[in-house]
From Swiss-Prot:
Domain of life: Bacteria
Gene this chain is encoded by: flgI
Signal listed as a keyword: yes
Signal peptide positions on this chain: 1-21
Protein name: Flagellar P-ring protein
């Protein structure tokens, strides 16, 4: 009996060390409480000769003519305006939940023509619309561009992107979105990651604190919570629930590979079994040259002959089997993979092969 209790205590201690507590607010979000996208089309002025080439971007000239006509300025028909300080841009923003009229939000400005840079430009008043084509905000202000560049004599140097920028607090909300918060007696909590175990643990924690039947797990991502009626009562109720702590069990072992950049990211649950890996690097170099043969006598009537000469060089390095030891923690996994001496691009193929062979104990996700 004492031996059984001692073993049970050891098991509980091991589970406690593997799990850690996190707040429900860090694991879930409230369904319906989300951002909405806004978009608009406008003009940026004040550029130092780095704007659109209006002959190649007729929409810039058309937009400028429409704006001037609204300001009472008429441009004679057929006028060919060669402007270099104006650029047509797209403006995007995120409408935050529960935003009120008069609140300011950040906007992102991106060139849609052939402007060289938006640095130093000013965005003119641009209406921002939602998917329902209603105007919800107005954007205007000076653009902050994070990049820098210079060009002279056919040479140019550029750091970061010059055709996009940001305006902090650059848009003012003019229309409020209708909200259904507080209208019903239930609220759905959506888990950030689908997990049946986590959904049930959140349900049990809420039921222990608020009484049985207060929460129900609908699926691996949704927990439905019964709340009192009224906005203020629901705000207080959610504030208490979101600050509850839940023991988080270890996550699924996962390796994420970015096929475009070659980056490989893995969590600490990834483990390796013993295996042998051989990876050969094959490189092919093709060099083509043109040999010109001319006659020795300029007036002898001979012809110049051009003969191509192609040289192909094929090299293969590596290829020997490398032993990979069984690894039980992330540091050991990293050391074992680094011992292969493979580049990130090679590592992508190696990890796929190791998973197929059953040596990689993790889910492999390629983005």
């Amino acid at each position: 009996m004492y031996v059984f209790k001692a073993l049970a205590g050891i098991v509980l201690a091991l589970v406690a060390t593997l799990a850690h507590a996190e707040r429900i607010r860090d694991l879930t979000s409230v369904q319906g409480v989300r951002e909405n996208s806004l978009i608009g089309y406008g003009l940026v002025v004040g550029l130092d000769g780095t704007g659109d080439q209006t002959t190649q971007t007729p929409f810039t000239t058309q937009t400028l003519n429409n704006m001037l006509s609204q300001l009472g300025i008429t441009v004679p028909t057929g006028t060919n305006m060669q402007l270099k300080n104006v650029a047509a841009v797209m403006v995007t923003a995120s409408y935050p939940p529960f935003a009120r009229q008069g609140q300011t939000i950040d906007v992102v400005v991106s060139s849609m023509g052939n402007a060289k840079s938006l640095r130093g430009g000013t965005l003119l008043m641009t209406p921002l619309k939602g998917v329902d084509s209603q105007v919800y905000a107005l954007a205007q202000g000076n653009i902050l561009v994070g990049g820098a560049g210079a060009s002279a004599g056919g040479s140019s140097v550029q750091v970061n992107q010059l055709n996009g920028g940001r305006i902090t607090n650059g848009a003012i909300i003019e229309r409020e979105l209708p909200s259904q918060f507080g209208a019903g007696n239930t609220i759905n909590l959506q888990l950030n990651d689908e997990d049946f175990t986590m959904a049930q643990q959140i349900t049990d924690a809420i039921n222990r604190a608020r009484g049985y039947g207060s929460a129900t797990a609908l699926d691996a991502r949704t927990v439905q919570v019964r709340v009192p009626s009224g906005n203020s009562s629901q705000v207080r109720f959610l504030a208490d629930i979101q600050n509850m702590e839940v023991n988080v069990t270890p996550q699924d072992a996962k390796v994420v590979i970015n096929s475009r950049t070659g980056s490989v990211v893995m969590n600490r649950e990834v483990t390796l079994d013993s295996c042998a890996v051989a990876q050969g690097n094959l490189s092919v170099t093709v060099n083509r040259q043109l040999n010109v043969n001319q006659p020795n006598t300029p007036f002898g009537g001979g012809q110049t002959v051009v003969t191509p000469q192609t040289q192909i060089d094929l090299r293969q390095s590596g290829g020997s089997l490398q032993s990979v030891r069984s690894s039980a923690n992330l540091n050991s996994v990293v050391r074992a993979l680094n011992a292969l001496g493979a580049t990130p691009m090679d590592l992508m193929s190696i990890l796929q092969s190791m998973q197929s062979a059953g040596c990689l104990r993790a889910k492999l996700e390629i983005i």
